[in-house]
Amino acid sequence: MGATKSKPREGGPRSRSLDIVEGSHQPFTSLSASQTPNKSLDSHRPPAQPFGGNCDLTPFGGINFSDTITSPQRTGPLAGGVTTFVALYDYESRTETDLSFKKGERLQIVNNTEGDWWLARSLSSGQTGYIPSNYVAPSDSIQAEEWYLGKITRREAERLLLSLENPRGTFLVRESETTKGAYCLSVSDYDANRGLNVKHYKIRKLDSGGFYITSRTQFISLQQLVAYYSKHADGLCHRLTTVCPTAKPQTQGLSRDAWEIPRDSLRLELKLGQGCFGEVWMGTWNGTTRVAIKTLKPGTMSPEAFLQEAQVMKKLRHEKLVQLYAVVSEEPIYIVTEYISKGSLLDFLKGEMGRYLRLPQLVDMAAQIASGMAYVERMNYVHRDLRAANILVGENLVCKVADFGLARLIEDNEYTARQGAKFPIKWTAPEAALYGRFTIKSDVWSFGILLTELTTKGRVPYPGMVNREVLDQVERGYRMPCPPDCPESLHDLMFQCWRKDPEERPTFEYLQAFLEDYFTATEPQYQPGDNL
């Protein structure tokens, strides 16, 4: 977003610009003006401190096995009798009933009635087994094209394209957000004034079924359009050079039948953190799959209540939520999730990398968290413990919300008293702390506190004040002042989150939109400073 003007690898000659550019945006993940775009950010990073050892609920763990943002799901139920699909990614079987396959392999779908895992037969090996349905697409369809990412937002397209690893001309095609039935071509570019940026070109559809960006050059198919602009810029900011890299998506669950799993199917390998209620480990399931495992101390919560809540939690599926994979439901309870490589946002902010983060990256992280919480809001769910310690950071500054809903189940007296030593009073809305009224609006209050954690690089809220004092002062109308170097417009947003009447606080949908458009609609003149 604002600070860096690192020059990317050249992908070919530059050409004149089309007039029908849908828009462009500044980079998200550039951290330092001295960095070169061919060099991974990880070369500047010390080993992550995955989790702290404070006496709070520590988050789940998680990984994306690739160094890029998780790609969207592009497939759904079979339509029109199509039974031959093509693999979008490699997949190694995790159980005896799974089917391994390679990217590009053709598969015949035998049974797709079980939702997330389909029974398929490989047309090359003849073997049959279950496959993750979001790893395949109908053969010869637009969904099978590597450059087609379907229904992703403009903002997510920019996050993917603005990696320093990508050369000019890196591209993807997605559905248009503004015009039904139309598509958008998003292309990475570079210029000396604006640095790395993305141009968006609307692809319109002809009544006869063809496609065009400019009416003087028309194509029978999207494939033909992409092939043409890969050879000729012809008005684009740059010819198309490289398909935008994406990571394998998370499978929905570990395998077809893995939900309540035996304890001996898990191997705990590396302890990542410890809190008052348990530990977090990196481990392996079934000898095949990297996972994070949260172990809860006996007595922390009722196994019956946990299992009931987990049935709801596993249905929450969003790219900005840590995915719950499986559980061991007998005490000690184990919670198995995706493993995310950089650990908690709190430790990330306080660590070596926090020094390199500037306001554009911090606001983008906040927008991602708001996106995940907007989904929680739509699903009529409540987090109850939203703070930086319960957000996980992956590659390319991807943020995911963890530990949603667990706080409600804790039976520890020091926690359930709501003013005990283990309760996160400084993050909790007054109506929740005093009267137990936890709603999505109390989560909005907590999000405002989380914004102070971001802008202060992990400082504890209400510095110098103890919990009892915080509760008294907030009830009297005290609100934290604007953090150093933080724009007043962002502090105003925090104040909206801290309105006394919960119904007057903004929705997460509004917060997401505000933060995603922050540097175009609210702070277009932003210039990076020494800290933010």
UniProtKB/Swiss-Prot annotation:
A cellular-component GO term for this protein: plasma membrane
Keyword presence, Transferase: yes
Entry keyword annotation includes Iron-sulfur: no
Active-site positions on this chain: D385 (proton acceptor)
Domain of life assignment: Eukaryota
Stored PROSITE patterns: PROTEIN_KINASE_ATP (PS00107), PROTEIN_KINASE_DOM (PS50011), PROTEIN_KINASE_TYR (PS00109), SH2 (PS50001), SH3 (PS50002)
N-myristoyl glycine lipid sites: G2
E.C. numbers: 2.7.10.2
Matches recorded under SUPFAM superfamilies: Protein kinase-like (PK-like) (SSF56112), SH2 domain (SSF55550), SH3-domain (SSF50044)
UniProt similarity note: Belongs to the protein kinase superfamily. Tyr protein kinase family. SRC subfamily.
Protein name: Tyrosine-protein kinase Src-1
Source organism (scientific name): Xenopus laevis (African clawed frog)
